[in-house]
Design a protein with these regions (language model features):
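C-terminal motif of bacterial Sec signal peptides marking the signal peptidase cleavage site
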Residues: 18-22
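Short, well-ordered beta-strand elements
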Residues: 28-33, 184-196, 214-220, 284
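Extracytoplasmic "Venus flytrap"
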Residues: 37-41, 183-205, 224-226
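Periplasmic-binding protein-like
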Residues: 44-45, 49, 139, 147-168
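Ligand-binding "clamshell"
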Residues: 92, 105-117, 249-261
């Protein structure tokens, strides 16, 4: 009886130790929150691949999802979250990969606060978008000229300290010589945008257009869907919030007819620490 009791106690102790070890392993799993829309999720995963933490399947490219991860040597657990909500879940995960506009909006400085950033790439330049067929209207050309101005380029450089960079090669004076601005006087151009930095940049263009008695009505949205829907429906003239890979994917998925008019600036995506303060925890 004593032997059986000893064996039982020994088995219980081993089982308890195993359970504790398992719990400890669970606690050691690194969680990284990434955007759940196709193109931004791909950007996040490509950044992690560049850093050496995962390997993606050949050809996954700019439409990669977590299902395209071929090798995950550090056992990272991925949480797919709406891009705008990533700053809100940062405290609940080890890391989050966040678009610069949402990081800035949440009070984060992409240059100072991120642990890693993707390189600037024109593939992800944010663009002015209109419905197909409206690209060459004087109103849109006037808005484009204002956004491609030296005033906007200077504002971006002085305001965002490298977190946002202008992609306009030869900024102008804000006006298009081919437009009859007198004919546009008294008109209103409507544009949908996310608050930061898009609406802020548009505010500079608004001042430029106001010099010609043109009103720029900036309508703010906090999601990535409605700004495209209102341009497709004709409720709004243009939008300014997205990059071309996202636009192409949106058109394909929704049957919309939206086109990019001009690339204005790029925002490198950043990897931010939540529960962790350095990247060392991933490989430890």
């Amino acid at each position: 009886m004593k032997l059986k009791r000893f064996v039982s106690l020994l088995l219980c102790a081993v089982l308890s130790l195993s359970l504790l070890t398992a719990c400890g392993d669970t606690d050691d799993v690194i969680t990284i929150a990434v955007p759940n829309d196709t193109t931004n999720e791909a950007r996040a995963l490509l950044l992690l691949e560049e850093l050496g933490y995962i390997t993606l399947k050949d050809g996954a490219g700019i439409t990669a999802t977590v299902g395209d991860i071929e090798d995950n040597p550090y056992g990272i657990e991925f949480n797919e979250v709406e891009a705008a909500q990533l700053p809100n879940v940062l405290q609940d995960v080890d890391y989050a990969i966040i678009n610069s506009n949402y990081a800035i909006e949440a009070g984060l400085n992409p240059v100072e606060d991120s642990l890693a950033m993707e390189g600037s790439s024109s593939a992800y330049s944010n663009v002015l978008v209109v419905k197909e067929g409206n690209e060459d209207t004087d109103a849109i050309k006037a808005l484009q000229a204002a956004l491609e101005s030296q005033q906007v380029a200077d504002y971006i450089a002085s305001t965002y300290d490298g977190a946002v960079a202008s992609t306009v090669d030869n900024p102008g004076d804000g006006y298009d010589d081919t437009i009859d601005y007198d004919a546009l006087a008294g008109t209103t151009i409507t544009v949908a945008a996310s608050p930061t930095p898009h609406a802020e940049i548009l505010a500079v263009a608004k001042e430029i257009l106001a010099e010609k008695d043109i009103t720029l009505d900036i309508i703010e949205f906090t999601d990535y869907v409605q700004p495209n829907n209102v341009v497709e429906s004709g409720e709004v003239d243009a939008n300014y919030f997205q990059h071309i890979p996202y636009l192409d994917d949106f058109n394909e998925q929704n049957g919309t007819h939206l086109v990019a008019v001009s690339a204005i600036r790029v925002e490198p995506m950043g990897l931010y620490g939540g529960k962790q303060s350095s990247l060392d925890a991933i490989t430890e």
